[in-house]
């Protein structure tokens, strides 16, 4: 946080700070009056008291200025930190989702059923019939079109992130689509730039905007050309239409309160998508702010706090060029939206007092203000003692002479008590702000961690079911049914397909093909000898049985393995022979969804590596100083950056993955409670004593992503079909140490509990 704050702009919107400022000004004026009265009425012996009052008044002025500036900085930092985290998390979720789309389009464009069918359409089926360019689909082509449509639908049924999948020939004519509707007028041939680029380019092409093939709203399309399986001539283009609007609303919904707006921008600040189109509509242009300094910006006559986040590449992919996310909060709502839970009141008194004793580590301004307030109270007390000791006594009956300074002493005592109450409340508020900021950070972090996990597992569940539809793998198993090993040609074909898949989807350590008896026939990364599922080995009996019993092509099974003490999960899907009557035009089957199981595909998901990468991206490791364990930042005048640990854990607390080393996998963190009772979608953050330290503890349970873990019917069917996704039961956990437990905190809390309460609140 930069040290310069636009105080005049921010201060009017901080009600609590303004109330404290008014009280402190009143206190300062009262001390000025006391000092003036003492100067007028003090005797020669009372000059020491006047000097002490001057020091007190000056100390109060410095304390007032420092306290207000600290409260202002803390409130501004909390607001900017929340906006920054939400903006960064939004672009991170989007980029990871779109990375999967680039792999999907590459996989499906190589599908041999699609390529063979497109070749037949273009070749006129070797019967001299007109090709696609001569006028589109005709009656003779209807069975082939139905075959293509069914094949596309079998893919889309497993990936609802796509609202349509289309096949275009080289002239831009739509040949088939997953979402075909009877009676719908076909779109005109496509001649758009992205389509022409797809025909000429080997890799995928992405396009966002209007398109004649999908009229209506702007679309995000991932396209890649299809090649003739024998001549390698370009046959057309496969188009995956991403359900962009629903995805953006899901990402925005996982962010902050309604008092702010989330945006997706291009590199020039043009709004592509908005969480509230009635507030800031797509097509608007907004100012951007990539730094963390508080710099209010004006848009459409309203002043906002703004944080913009650029994409960080994931697996080398950074999303469409220039895309970035931004969160904007109106200045008049940004601080009103800050929740002020009674953090200290909810804590055990001993923990609250211990945190104040450790404030230097997690909130240096709070530590400085508390020490300054103690110094002021000490000066006031010394002044009262000094004045009382200098009051002259009457020789008659030991009574004191009436002295003008006595009124000053009385005012000094009353004002000292009031000063203590006002500063106690202000410091209490600063303490609340510091702690609530960190608690909110942990809530936001854990919500992101679960969003990342569920989206990742959604992709894994869909990958295995997609690839089980691969015609080349089905053919290998069919042609070699009953053989002890694959022929050289079949082995080469299978391994080549598996290597191509693994090259597209790098999150897998290995992809293996096995027969109905569980014998692994081929795999990717065969040269990596230490990995499970090598050719010639067998799939675990329980996993094989679960895979064979899978109900249909929509079901899958997850197997948990122990690879040298490290967790590894294997996603299994069944490959099926074509069922009777499933063959369509020209003797080709489309997917083999309901036939008997002839084998399976196994995706070795390196759980620790991939989950650790997610944790490290969301909670990067901070360098720490030796004295306080807090990272130093010369540009940061707010809260120090304390090291934070993040985990994915089982409900019983066993660590499955950790952001940083130091804790053995499979171990539990003593003192962390409440994981088993987390409800779906619940997020918690609290302050606990753990391992001899005061710690912020955050945790969250998944709330589901699309149909993944949401549809109760699907969940029931999954149980019946032996689908057991153990990863889906994980929860996230974060831990941040604020400082060692203070030895005298409990005794101090007991003493303060019995102390006079001047402001109606527990003394701080």
Can you say where each PLM-predicted feature lies in the sequence?
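Short, surface-exposed beta-strand-loop junctions and turns on beta-sheet-rich folds
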Residues: 181-183, 213, 278-280, 312, ...
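Intrinsically disordered, low-complexity domain-flanking/linker segments in eukaryotic proteins
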Residues: 126-133, 579-593, 622-634, 710-723
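Extracytoplasmic/periplasmic sensory segments of membrane signal-transduction proteins
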Residues: 17, 27-200, 386-552, 615-618, ...
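Conserved long hydrophobic alpha-helices within structured protein cores
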Residues: 102-110, 219, 237-241, 298-308, ...
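Extracellular/periplasmic juxtamembrane segments that couple receptor/chemosensory ectodomains to their
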Residues: 2-74, 284-437, 667-764
């Amino acid at each position: 946080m930069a040290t310069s704050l636009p105080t005049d702009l921010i201060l009017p919107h901080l009600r609590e700070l303004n109330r404290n400022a008014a009280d402190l000004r009143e206190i300062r004026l009262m001390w000025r009056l006391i000092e003036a009265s003492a100067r007028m009425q003090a005797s020669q012996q009372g000059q020491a008291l006047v000097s002490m009052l001057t020091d007190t008044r000056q100390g109060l002025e410095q304390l007032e200025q420092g306290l207000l500036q600290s409260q202002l900085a803390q409130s501004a930092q909390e607001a900017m930190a929340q906006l920054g985290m939400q903006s960064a998390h939004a672009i991170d979720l989007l980029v990871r989702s779109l990375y999967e789309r680039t792999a999907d389009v590459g996989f499906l464009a190589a599908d041999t059923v699609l390529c063979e069918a497109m070749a037949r359409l273009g070749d006129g089926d070797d019967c001299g019939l007109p090709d696609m360019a001569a006028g589109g689909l005709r009656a003779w082509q209807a069975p082939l079109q139905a075959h293509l449509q069914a094949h596309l639908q079998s893919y889309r049924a497993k990936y609802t992130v796509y609202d349509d999948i289309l096949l275009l020939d080289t002239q831009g004519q739509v040949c088939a689509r997953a979402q075909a509707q009877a009676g719908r007028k076909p779109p005109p041939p496509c001649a758009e730039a992205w389509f022409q680029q797809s025909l000429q380019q080997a890799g995928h092409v992405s396009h966002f905007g209007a398109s004649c093939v999908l009229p209506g709203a702007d679309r995000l399309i991932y396209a890649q050309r299809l090649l003739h399986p024998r001549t390698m001539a370009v046959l057309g283009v496969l188009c995956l239409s991403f359900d962009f609007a629903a995805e953006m609303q899901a990402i925005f919904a996982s962010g902050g309160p309604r008092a702010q707006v989330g945006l997706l921008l291009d590199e020039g600040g043009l709004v592509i998508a908005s969480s509230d189109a009635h507030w800031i509509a797509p097509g608007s242009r907004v100012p951007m702010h990539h730094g963390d300094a508080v710099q209010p910006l004006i848009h459409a006559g309203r002043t906002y706090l703004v944080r913009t986040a650029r994409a960080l590449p994931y697996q080398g992919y950074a999303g469409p060029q220039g895309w970035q996310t931004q969160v904007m909060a109106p200045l008049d709502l940004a601080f009103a939206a800050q929740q002020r839970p009674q953090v200290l009141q909810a804590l055990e008194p001993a923990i609250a007092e211990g945190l104040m004793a450790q404030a230097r580590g997690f909130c240096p301004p709070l530590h400085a203000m508390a020490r300054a307030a103690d110094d002021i109270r000490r000066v006031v007390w010394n002044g009262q003692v000094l004045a009382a000791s200098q009051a002259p006594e009457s020789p008659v009956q030991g009574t004191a002479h009436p002295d003008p300074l006595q009124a000053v002493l009385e005012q000094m005592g009353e004002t000292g008590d009031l000063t203590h109450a006002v500063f106690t409340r202000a410091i209490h508020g600063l303490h609340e702000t510091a702690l609530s900021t960190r608690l909110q950070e942990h809530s936001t972090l854990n919500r992101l961690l679960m969003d990342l996990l569920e989206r990742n597992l959604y992709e894994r569940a869909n990958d295995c079911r997609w690839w089980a539809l691969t015609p080349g793998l089905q053919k290998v198993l069919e042609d070699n049914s009953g053989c002890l090993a694959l022929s050289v040609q079949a082995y080469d074909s299978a391994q080549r397909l598996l290597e191509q898949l693994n090259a597209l989807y790098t999150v897998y350590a290995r992809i293996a093909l096995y027969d109905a008896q569980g014998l692994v026939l081929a795999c990717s990364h065969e040269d990596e000898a230490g990995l499970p599922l090598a050719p010639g080995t067998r799939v675990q009996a329980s996993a094989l049985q679960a895979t064979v019993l899978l109900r249909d092509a929509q079901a899958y099974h997850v197997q948990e393995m122990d690879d040298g003490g490290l967790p590894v999960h294997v996603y299994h899907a069944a490959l099926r022979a074509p069922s009777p009557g499933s063959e369509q035009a020209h003797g080709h089957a489309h997917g083999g969804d309901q036939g008997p199981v002839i084998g399976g595909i196994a995706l070795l998901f390196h759980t620790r590596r991939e989950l650790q990468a997610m944790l490290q991206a969301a909670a990067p490791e901070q360098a720490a100083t030796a004295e306080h364990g807090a990272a130093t930042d010369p540009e940061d005048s707010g809260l120090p950056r304390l090291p934070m640990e993040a985990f994915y854990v089982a409900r019983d607390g066993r660590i499955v993955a950790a952001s940083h080393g130091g804790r053995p996998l499979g171990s539990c963190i003593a003192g962390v409670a409440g994981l088993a009772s987390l409800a779906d979608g619940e997020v918690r953050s609290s302050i606990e004593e753990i391992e001899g330290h005061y710690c912020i503890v955050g945790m969250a349970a998944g709330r589901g992503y699309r149909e993944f873990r949401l549809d109760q019917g699907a969940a029931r069917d999954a149980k019946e079909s032996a689908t057991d996704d153990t990863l889906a039961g994980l929860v996230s956990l974060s831990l941040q140490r604020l400082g060692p437990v203070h030895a005298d905190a409990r005794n101090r809390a007991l003493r303060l509990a019995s102390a006079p309460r001047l402001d109606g609140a527990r003394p701080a």
